[in-house]
Structure formats: C-alpha cells, structure tokens
Amino acid sequence: MLGNILSAIDLPKGVVNILPVAAAVGEKVMSQAAKGIKDISLELGGKSAIIVCADADIEYACDLIIGGIFTNAGQICSATSRLIVHQDIADALFERLKTKTENLSIGDGFDTDTQMGPLVSEQQLNQVKKYFDIAMTEKLGCLTGGKVLGRAGYFVTPTIYHNVPVTSQLWTEEVFGPVLVSKTFAEDLDAIRLANDSKFALAATIVSADEDAALKMALQIQAGHIWINEQQIVLPQAGWGGFKQSGIGRELGSDGLSAYQKSKHVLLTH
C-alpha cells in the first residue's frame, strides 16, 4: 500500500525502496552500500524474549505475554516470541495463559471487538504454516493453536509451544506470526543466558514485582530496547534499534537524528 502511494506522487525512482525485513536482505543492502562507502543503518528482525520472574503477578504477566506476541498477529519486529518463565509459577501461568489465548476474538482488523486479525498475505500464511509443520516434525509440545483457521482470509490460531529445545528452529528463527515458544528457568542467570542465546538482540520484556532486580537483569540482557512490566511501547524521544543481526544504527531520539547529520570541527589559530 505504501509503495502504491509513493509511486502515485512525483518521487524519483530509487529514493524509496521497500524491502522485506530480514538479516539476509540487510547483508545485501550493506554490500551495495560498501561499494560507495555509504552510511547505512539497518533495523532488521528479532526473536525477543519475555522473562516472567517468580514474583510476577500471573494475570498481568499473561496480558503482557499476549500483547507482546499476538498484537498484529505477531507481525512485529520486536514481538516477544520467546517466553522464559520461572519454574515455580510455570504451571499456574501456562494454565491461565492457555485459557486467555483460546478466548481471544479473532477476526476483521477493522472490527473493534477483534483482538487478533489475519496475517498480511498468503505468502506470510505459508511462512507460518511452514513453522507449524516444523513443530510437528520436531514433536514440540503444543499448548494451544498450531492450526490454520478454515475461513476466508489469512487466519491462523494464536499458538503456544512449551518446553521447546533451544536447538529448535522455532526457538532460533523469526516466524513473524502469532507463534510463542517457551521454556522455564530456575535462576536469574539461567533466564539471562536463555534470553541472550540468540542471533538477534532487538528487544526484551521483564515481568517482576522487584524493580531493582528487574533493572539488574536488564543490564545483563543483550537487547537494544527493554521493557520492565510493559510491552511494545516505543517513545519517539528514545532511540530504537538492536544489536547482533537485529541491525545497526538507531532510529528515533537524538541517536536517530544524528544518523542524518555530519559533524565538522574547524580549528582557527589567531
């Protein structure tokens, strides 16, 4: 849609190019920029973690989990698609999360009662279906979902897999759909290790009643943007971007502005 709008105005070809968000695409863009030593910033994909600590309020944690992965049917670069939950509350949390997920209203995105809409295209539907098939091949435990809905449009069920091995493709690869994978942890260091065990490092969420402990954990997590007891809030005054294969450079804030500026120093002796 954006491409059609831009093509309808008097904009020279090549000024705006619309590309899929993927590390492989970023590599090609970087290689082209290298030929002319051009400045570049890249905001690519993610496989962000949401860590739920033992002292977290389960009801609120479930709301953050659902909002972090099922908003826009998971088609958000910063979607928190890896759930890392403390083993002491895991059973209670998964029970409540399953109920709330299965009660989500799925339908037309323009309907105010809809809580999760469709995928954007048949291509993306096939992408998500591919990961459903991989999950079956890998014999992953499916808490809920894992199906294409038999209705007009590109609808799938909101899906949760539990006790997913870190070697699984669903744990390591960006699905870009409403698919959540999960593991449990015993110690904070275990949660941090799991969160950082990714080629991506865009965002993360920490859910805890202890803000000091959450801040301490946040300092050890490799991610460009970390929410504590919140999810998917992006402030224009704060820089946005990630590490590793999630990209280079920053958008928004003073960091984003500096990407479009050049510093110059003039020294005069007299």
What kind of feature is each model-predicted range?
Residues 1, 29-31, 95-96, 218-219, ...:
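Short amphipathic alpha-helical segments
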Residues 1-21:
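PLP-dependent aminotransferase-like
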Residues 11, 51, 105, 148, ...:
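Conserved C-terminal structural/oligomerization subdomain of aldehyde/semialdehyde dehydrogenase
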Residues 15, 25-165, 228:
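ALDH superfamily catalytic-core signature
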Residues 20-21, 56, 88-89, 186, ...:
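Short beta->alpha linker loops
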Residues 23-25, 35, 212-213, 235:
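Short alpha-helical
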